[in-house]
Amino acid sequence: MSPFPRHRGLRAAGLLGAIIAMPLWAGLAAAPAMHTTAGERHNDRTTWDSVFSAAQAGRGETTYKQLCARCHMETLAGGDEAGELTGSAFMSSWNGQTLAALHERIRTSMPTDTPGVYSSQQVTDVIAYLLHFNGFPPGAVELTHTNDALQNIRFVTTPP
């Protein structure tokens, strides 16, 4: 006999409610947050998700040839003064990092004689060109030059 005979029905209802609610709680815990802000999300996309447009890559190619090819060469192979921007060494050095890191590196260190003179949009367009040149697929939407947007895109060398 229960020490609380009057509350037997309440205990049974509570136990039944807990059993029914447990899968719901587990599902909520496993699901991504519904109100996640851009600053809280990380790396939801990769360079294989068509994160730039062909038109943007075209602008980036023009900018690259005007501002970068002098040191990095038109073939992006690099030279005595500058590293390569294509090939296995380039790809492996950026693999797993965010496009925000690549953007920041270019924006703050290029050109080496006067770093920081290129606009964020110029750098983003050049990144679109680098991605296109290295075989990543273009899409319908341009790569956005905001840090939050770039922070959510990982440079991944192997296709999914």
Q: What annotation goes with each model-predicted range?
A:
Residues L24-E40:
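Signal peptide processing junction and immediate N-terminal pro/mature segment
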Residues G14-G27:
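Bacterial N-terminal signal peptides
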Residues M1-L10:
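N-terminal secretory signal peptides that target proteins for export/translocation
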Residues P115-P160:
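Flexible coil segments in periplasmic/lumen-exposed cytochrome c-class electron-transfer proteins
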Residues V51, A57, T75-P111:
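Gly/Gly-Pro-rich "capping" loops immediately C-terminal to redox-active cysteine motifs
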Residues H35-T63:
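Electrostatic cytochrome c docking/interface patches
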Residues G60, Y64-T75, V126, L130:
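The canonical Cys-X-X-Cys-His
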